[in-house]
């Protein structure tokens, strides 16, 4: 895993209690474009969470997986890498 982290980087997605995302990336080759990438990734996560309906929207695991996939897909579009992605929800230890 250590080599994969060094090669592909890592994304950390933090969802507050209202479901607003914050994205932090480490080791991604996006020096000049980092701020634009973060803005697009956060927008993509918001759209993905908005598509969840009914029981899925209330299921913590489904919300975390939708956010993880949206952030990872944005990173792949921008950098060509598939970083390890961790989602942390407010109130989670």
Question: What is each PLM-predicted segment?
Answer:
Residues 1-93:
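Acidic/His-rich, metal-assisted hydrolase cores and their charged scaffolds
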């Amino acid at each position: 895993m250590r080599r994969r982290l060094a090669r592909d980087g890592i994304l950390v997605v933090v969802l507050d209690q209202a479901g607003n995302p914050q994205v932090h990336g480490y080791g991604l080759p996006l020096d000049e474009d980092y701020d634009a990438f973060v803005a697009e990734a956060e927008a993509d996560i918001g759209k993905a969470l908005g598509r969840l309906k009914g029981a899925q929207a209330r299921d913590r695991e489904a919300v975390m997986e939708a956010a993880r996939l949206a952030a990872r897909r944005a990173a792949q579009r921008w950098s060509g890498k598939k970083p390890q992605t961790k989602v942390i929800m407010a109130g989670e230890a």
